[in-house]
């Protein structure tokens, strides 16, 4: 291949790389967010965490939009199949576990804590998405871990939890 042809191919590949990189950057989602709201969402996570440590189930329920929010771990296929032996329409989620969790906090004699890692917060106006890895710790030992996903919304100038879903390992 001649030097001119090699240079032309190199230039074409370079230009193609720049164009595809620019396209990829434009394809990234844009968010209408601000630092104050991100900070307030992070404070919501901290309040949630502190309510677990202090075992304040009632206080934790005030962080959610209403008592009917989705608050549930994702079931394995084995758990779904087992539940369908008694309920053919079981959807894999079931009723919210918020009340049960609040009661656990209020009545447990164990030391409880939820630790968050790799927190990512995305906010667009009055809607936010929070993802993180967690460890649920009982008496200073990790009981289970997983990924937790929250949807949050801003209403009456306050950030509230709209849904919480998590995996368990």
Language-model segments: what does each one mean?
Residues 9-18:
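Bacterial N-terminal signal peptides
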Residues 55-80:
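Short, well-ordered alpha-helical segments enriched in acidic and aromatic residues
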Residues 1-10:
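Bacterial N-terminal signal peptides that target proteins for export
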Residues 23-63:
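Short, low-complexity N-terminal intrinsically disordered segments enriched in polar/charged residues
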Residues 84-139:
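Surface-exposed, charged secondary-structure patches
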Residues 26-29, 74-85:
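Acidic/histidine-rich, surface-exposed loop or edge segments in extracytoplasmic proteins
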Residues 64-67, 75-76, 120, 132-136, ...:
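A mature extracytoplasmic/lumenal domain signature
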Residues 25, 129, 144-169:
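Short beta-strand edge/turn micro-motifs at domain boundaries
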């Amino acid at each position: 291949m001649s030097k001119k042809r090699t240079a032309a191919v190199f230039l074409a590949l370079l230009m193609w790389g720049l164009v595809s990189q620019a396209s990829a950057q434009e394809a990234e989602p844009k968010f209408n967010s601000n630092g104050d709201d991100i900070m307030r969402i992070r404070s919501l996570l901290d309040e949630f965490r502190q309510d677990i440590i202090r075992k304040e189930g009632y206080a934790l329920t005030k962080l959610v939009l209403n008592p009917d929010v989705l608050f549930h771990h994702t079931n394995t296929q084995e758990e779904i199949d087992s539940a369908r032996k008694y309920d053919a329409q079981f959807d894999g989620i079931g009723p919210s576990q918020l009340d049960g969790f609040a009661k656990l906090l209020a009545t447990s004699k164990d030391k409880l804590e939820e630790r968050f890692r790799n927190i990512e917060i995305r906010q667009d106006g009055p809607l936010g998405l929070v993802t993180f890895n967690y460890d649920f710790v009982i008496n200073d030992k990790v009981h289970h871990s997983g990924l937790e996903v929250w949807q949050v919304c801003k209403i009456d100038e306050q950030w509230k939890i709209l849904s919480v879903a998590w995996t368990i390992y």
